[in-house]
Amino acid sequence: MDTSPHSKPSSSSASQSSHSPSPAPVTAPRKTRDSGLCMTQDIPEIPTHCIDNLNSHQLGRGTYGIVEKTRYRRSRNHEYRPAAIKYSSPIHLATLIREAKVMWALRDHSNIIKIYGLYRDARHGQGVVMEYMDCGSMSELIYDRKSIDYTIDHVASWLYQMASAVNTFHRNDQVHRDLKLQNMLLCDRYRTMKLCDFGTFTAMHQSMTSNRGTPITMAPEVFRCEEYNQKSDIYSIGIIMWQMIARNHPYNRNLSVPGLLYNVATASLRPPELDCNPILSDFYKQCWHDDPVSRPTAAECLQYFTALKTEYPNGNVPLADANTNRPVETPPPRVHRPSGLGSASGSGLGTNGRTPTASNHLNAPQAVNTHRRNRSETIQMKPELPYPVMPGEVAASSSGAFRGPRSQSEAKNLRDAGRSQSGQRHPHRNAPPIPIDDRRDSNESNEKDAIFMELLRNDDTRPVDPDARDEASLDIFHQHCSSNKEYADALLLKKEVLRAKHELLSRWPQHQRHVELLERQNYLEQEIAKLEYNSDDDFSITERL
C-alpha cells in the first residue's frame, strides 16, 4: 500500500498568510499544549476528488463525532484504496487537529496508524483521513471473537509491536496516556497491530497531574493526581499483557468506576493471578508495580518482548478459526453501533450516566490453554463465572499454563531480559503487612476507606462516570472524588467525636460515684478532725482537774 503523503500545503493557510499583517516580534516562544508536537509541519489537505463519498458508510458514532469507512486515492492517476475518516464535533475540533499533528509526526513508524491528510466535508465538517484497519481492534478480537484462536507467539508479536511504538514516544519525551486494547487496531488477518487515538498524547515538559486515560489501564499515580511520567504507559502495558494472556476482563465489570480507581490507587488492586509461566507473570507484575520507579522503561520492555518474540517466533502464522479449523479470514466491515465508538465510549464500565450499584467483588478469570500446536500454545477461555465471587468463597483457579520445553537458563535469560539492572522482583499484588504499632492508624484508614466506598455507592454522593477524553469531565470527576474524600474525613471525625462522647457518657455514672466517694471521704476526714480536736480539749481539762 502506497502511504506517501501529499506535499501540497493548505490553501486556506496560504490565503491567510497573504492577507494577514506581519506579526509583532516576540522575545521568547510561548510553550503551549502543542509545544514540541510537530508545530512546524503542515498536514496536507485532501481535495474532494480524492475521496469516494458515494461509497462511504458510517462505522460508528460517539460524543466526539463519527468515523466513516471510505475510499481514498492520492490523485486522479492513482487507484482508490480503503481508508477511514474521523470527523469531530465542533467543540472537539481542536483535539482532533492536535491528534492529527501527533499522528503526522509519527507517520513513519510501522506500528502507528498512518494519516493521509485533512479533509473537509460539507456534511460533517473537518475530518482526518487515515488508513483503514480491516480487522478491528484488539478488544474485539479478545472479547468478541472467541472462536478465533491465537497463540503465545502472536501475543509476543503484538506486544513487541506495541513496545516498539511506545519506545518511540518515550525517546522523544512524550507519553500516550491512554494505551488500551481499543486503541490497538489490527490488519493483515490480525497479525499486524498499530496504535491509534492520540487525543491524550502529550509532551513531558507539560505539567502532568490530570487524571487522563481509561480507568482499567490508568496507573495509580495518575488517579492520585500526582506527578507522573512515561512509567504510566508501562503500567498500561502490564494490564494489556495480562488481558492478552487471560483473554478475559481484568476486573469485575459490575465494579463502579470510582470504586475501581480508588481501589487501584489505594489498595493496590490488580488483576487476579494467572497460572502461567513466571517468565510472563513476573514481567507484567513488574510493569504494574505501584511504585513507578520499580517499573521497567520502554526500552527494557522492548528488549524483553524482543527476547520473547525470538523464543516464540511464529507470530506471522495465520490465526485459526475454531469453527472451521482453517486460517482466519479478514472479517466483514463493521456496522454502526448507536451506543458510540469504541475509542470514544469512555471507561467501558457501565453507562455514561450514573454508575451502577457498586460491587467490590471480582470475577476470577479462568485462562486455559490447549495442547501445544506448532510450538505455540493456543489461548482459550472457560465461560465467565455467572455471579460475583463473594467474600470467603474461593474462585476456580486457572488450570492452564504457558509451558514449553525450555531450559532453565533460557527461562532465566527471558525473565531478566526486560528487568532493569537495579530493579528487584517486587512482591505480589497483596498489600504489605501492617506493623503492630501502626494497627490503630490502619483501623482508622480502613474505616475511612469503608466510609468513602459507602459514599461511592450512595445515589446522592457517587460521581458520574467520567469521559476519558474530555478534560472538563475528568476534572469534575476528580473534584467530586476529592470532595467525597474530604466528606469521608469529616464523617470519620464526627464518628470519632461521637464515639468519645458515648464513651464519656458510659463512664459518667462511675465518675459521679467517684465524686460522691471523694466528698464522703472529705466529710469523714473533717468529722475525724473535729473528734480529735474535741478529744484533745477533754484531755487538757482532765489534766487541770
Curated annotation (Swiss-Prot):
It holds the Pfam family Pkinase. Residues 53-308 form the Protein kinase domain. Part of the Wnt signaling pathway essential for the specification of the mesodermal cell fate in early embryos. Stimulates the wrm-1/lit-1-dependent phosphorylation of pop-1 and plays a role in the initial nuclear accumulation of wrm-1. The keyword Magnesium applies. Residues 1-21 have a biased composition (Low complexity). It is an enzyme of class 2 (transferase). Disulfide bonds: none annotated. One of its GO terms (cellular component) is cytoplasm. Its cofactor is Mg(2+). The active site is at D178 (proton acceptor). It comes from Caenorhabditis briggsae. Its EC number is 2.7.11.25. SMART domains: S_TKc. SUPFAM superfamilies: Protein kinase-like (PK-like) (SSF56112). This is Mitogen-activated protein kinase kinase kinase mom-4. Interacts with, and is activated by, tap-1. InterPro entries: Kinase-like_dom_sf, Prot_kinase_dom, Protein_kinase_ATP_BS, Ser-Thr/Tyr_kinase_cat_dom. One of its GO terms (biological process) is embryonic digestive tract morphogenesis. It catalyses: L-seryl-[protein] + ATP = O-phospho-L-seryl-[protein] + ADP + H(+); L-threonyl-[protein] + ATP = O-phospho-L-threonyl-[protein] + ADP + H(+). Residues 1-35, 316-444 are annotated as: Disordered. Residues 352-369, 396-411 have a biased composition (Polar residues).
